Structure formats: structure tokens, C-alpha cells
Design a protein with these regions (language model features):
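Rossmann-fold cofactor-recognition segment
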Residues: 46-60
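N-terminal Rossmann-like NAD(P) cofactor-binding module of classical short-chain dehydrogenase/reductase
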Residues: 73-76, 98-99
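Rossmann-fold NAD(P)-binding glycine/threonine-rich loop
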Residues: 102-123
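Conserved Rossmann-fold cofactor-binding substructure of NAD(P)-dependent oxidoreductases
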Residues: 57-70
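ADP-ribose/adenylate-binding Rossmann-like module
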Residues: 90-107
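Helix N-cap at the beta1-alpha1 junction of Rossmann-like dinucleotide-binding domains, i.e.
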Residues: 10, 34-38, 105
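N-terminal Rossmann NAD(P)H-binding glycine-rich loop of SDR-like oxidoreductase domains
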Residues: 6-9, 13-19
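C-terminal catalytic/substrate-binding lobe primarily of soluble NAD(P)-dependent oxidoreductases
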Residues: 142-379
Length: 379
């Protein structure tokens, strides 16, 4: 099997390369990135005999297709979400499958094209979204009627690496983190759908606090469309409470709340400057380089899913919890590349898996549930 890893020089990309390099079914790997500077030093912790480095402009469909048609079977896309559709279209044109970690709804409209081309595209194959959604599907099967689904997930530095006011460092893209701080959230409270505007996301009324064994108190911020997934699973009609929350060390919301009020996340260019630059662009370029992991620092992830409902006529509560740490020096992020192993096999041209867009969160809980629906206001 020949795998192309887009964004192979990034934090997650290097972890994926190491995992693939140790996998016997993988015969060769393309590490594709716009900047290959330091390839030898950044990949020195694993055997690179099967790896070929290729400089690639991922915004160019022509370059993507040329790379994919060089004997590639499956593409692992670890690029920013802005490039997801471009990558998927190039993969469809080239007849190769794609695994990525972004939400499915941004490329749902490509399903007919992918099916017509006999291509499988599997989004949401990371931790969040990904493993959390698989746990959704597995756990709700234990209930006759599900009332509560709350998901809490986050990646952040271990305590020893918390040396800045945010107590946060970047394991993927800083712009992606910034974008999530102003994203609207949809939840269900007391049986009613609630929309939490992105500019209100860090207000104290929406912030929760949870205790995580071994880590202590963590801050939980509403983020993402929880109703989208209960609709896909066909359980929204019985849900009384659902939400998706990002976990951070305490103080995250207190940091962002005044910055939002002062317009630091605005896209509007600031008048009086010698060039058109917005506060959002400024924060991206200023803070991103300052929030990188140092050589011997580790990241960690925490995931908690809480379920409540009826089973055998009794009210029960289920909790699934996961914690993990990465290796030092950015050699392997805690965000699990192994979560992509099964999707890679499913996307292989020889796999019997169904074609089109196939995400972990797109399977109904059971055939007796109500059919899939299209929620109003889906992002």
C-alpha cells in the first residue's frame, strides 16, 4: 500500500509518518508539505526508509493530482480545513481515497461525486471529531432511550510545559484554534435547542468545570454543533441535554473574554495601519510562533463522554474516559494517529467498504430509530 501524508512535516504529520513507517502493509509513504526544511532532523526518531519527501502546494489541484496519480492508494489529509475540499476533489479526480480529521458537513455535497468515482472519503477520523463519535455510536446502543449525551475533549500541554498566560500550546494549527474560539455552538438544554453565539462562547454562564482524574479541574467551553450528531444518530427526539465542549486548563475563558469584547477576533482591517490587517490576522501571526512545543515538552489529551437514559426500564448513566500523553520533542503528539489505521484500510481501492462520504458520526444508532434528518441551521 502506498500512502501520501499531506502536511507530513507538521506535529500530527510526523506522528502519522512514524506510525505508517512501522506498519508492514505500508510499502511506501509520501511526506508532502509546502516546506521540507529540517526533514532529516524532524523525522530522526523513526526509520524513514519507506518515506519520500515531496514539496507540494496543496492549493494547486494540478500538483495534488500529479502526486496522487504517482501510485498512491490512500491520502491522509492533515492540512487546515480551508484546503479540505480542494484535496477531496483532487482525490476524486485521481481515484484515490482520503482520510482526514475535519468535520464531514463541509464536504457532504461531494458524496455523489465520490460515489460515482468509486472513491471513499472518511472525514472525522481524529480524536474530536473521531474517537468521540465512535464512542457515541457504541455506547448509545446500551440504551433503550437516550436522554443525555455530553462530550468533553481537549488537547493541551502537560503542566510542566505550561509557561505562558494561556497554559496552551499548538499541536496542529493556531489559526484553527483561533477559529474555534469564535464558532457558534448548538446544544440542547431542557429539551430545547440552544444556539450559543461565538462571541458569547466564553461568557461565564456557558462555562462548565469538570474534574478529571490525575489532572484535576478542567474548564469546559461549548464548541461545535452537538445537535448535528444526535440528528445523524436518530436520537434527537428523546434528548433532553446534549453539548460538545472543548477542555482547557482553567483560565482559558478569562483570557479570551476581554479580548473578544475589545474586538481582537474581528476580521475587519484596523484603520491607520500601513497595510490591511485585521486583529484576527495579527493574533494568528503574533501568537502562533510563541505557542510552539519545545524539544522536551509533551502534550496530552483528555476525553470524557457522558450518557444518560433508560435501559431495562431503569435510568442509567455511562461515562467513557480517555487520557493520553505524547512523546517529548514533538516526536509523537497525543492526538492518536492510530485512530486512522482502520479508515486507511477502508479507503483502499481494494476494500469492500461503501464509497462516498463515510464518517464515524454518520451511522444511525439502530434500525429502529427514526431516519436521518437534516437539522435546520446546520453549519
Amino acid at each position: 500500500m502506498r500512502i501520501a501524508v499531506l502536511g507530513g512535516m507538521g506535529f500530527q504529520g510526523r506522528a502519522a509518518l512514524a506510525d505508517l513507517a512501522a506498519s508492514p502493509p505500508v510499502e511506501s509513504i509520501i511526506c508532502a508539505d509546502a516546506d521540507l526544511t529540517g526533514f532529516e532532523s524532524k523525522t530522526g526518531f523513526f526509520d524513514t526508509a519507506k518515506v519520500t519527501a515531496v514539496q507540494l502546494d496543496a492549493s494547486s489541484s494540478a500538483e495534488l493530482e500529479a502526486t496522487f496519480r504517482d501510485g498512491v492508494d490512500v491520502v491522509i489529509d492533515l492540512l487546515p480545513r480551508q484546503l479540505t475540499e480542494t484535496v477531496c476533489l483532487a482525490a476524486i479526480a485521481s481515484g484515490v481515497g482520503v482520510v482526514n480529521t475535519n468535520y464531514a458537513y463541509s464536504i457532504a455535497h461531494l458524496d455523489p461525486q465520490a460515489k460515482a468515482a468509486g472513491v471513499t472519503i472518511m472525514p472525522e477520523c481524529g480524536l474530536d471529531p473521531g474517537i468521540d463519535l465512535i464512542l457515541y455510536s457504541l455506547t448509545i446502543r446500551q440504551f433503550e432511550e437516550i436522554h443525555v449525551i455530553n462530550s468533553y475533549c481537549g488537547g493541551f500541554p502537560e503542566k510542566a510545559a505550561c509557561d505562558n498566560p494561556l497554559n496552551y500550546k499548538v499541536a496542529w494549527t493556531w489559526e484553527g484554534v483561533l477559529s474555534s474560539t469564535r464558532r457558534d455552538a448548538r446544544a440542547i438544554k431542557d429539551g430545547r435547542v440552544v444556539t450559543i453565539a461565538g462571541d458569547k462562547q466564553h461568557e461565564s454562564q456557558w462555562i462548565q468545570s469538570i474534574q478529571f482524574p490525575g489532572l484535576g479541574r478542567l474548564e469546559a467551553i461549548p464548541n461545535g454543533n452537538a445537535v448535528y450528531f444526535t440528528d445523524l444518530l436518530g436520537v434527537t427526539e428523546t434528548i433532553r441535554e446534549t453539548g460538545r465542549y472543548s477542555l482547557r486548563w482553567p483560565g482559558w475563558s478569562a483570557f479570551w473574554r476581554p479580548l473578544k469584547q475589545l474586538g481582537f477576533l474581528s476580521d475587519k482591517p484596523v484603520k491607520g495601519l500601513p497595510c490591511d490587517i485585521s486583529p484576527y490576522q495579527f493574533l494568528d501571526k503574533l501568537m502562533g510562533p510563541e505557542l510552539q512545543y519545545k524539544k522536551d515538552e509533551k502534550d496530552l489529551v483528555a476525553l470524557v463522554n457522558v450518557f444518560e437514559g433508560l435501559s431495562a426500564g431503569k435510568h442509567i448513566r455511562r461515562r467513557s474516559r480517555r487520557e493520553g500523553t505524547g512523546l517529548p520533542g514533538g516526536r509523537r503528539t497525543a492526538w492518536p494517529p492510530r485512530a486512522r489505521r482502520c479508515p486507511i484500510r477502508s479507503c483502499h481501492p481494494g476494500s469492500p467498504a461503501g464509497r462516498g462520504i463515510a464518517a464515524p458520526g454518520s451511522r444511525p444508532a439502530a434500525p429502529t430509530r427514526r431516519p436521518w434528518s437534516t437539522p435546520a441551521g446546520r453549519p
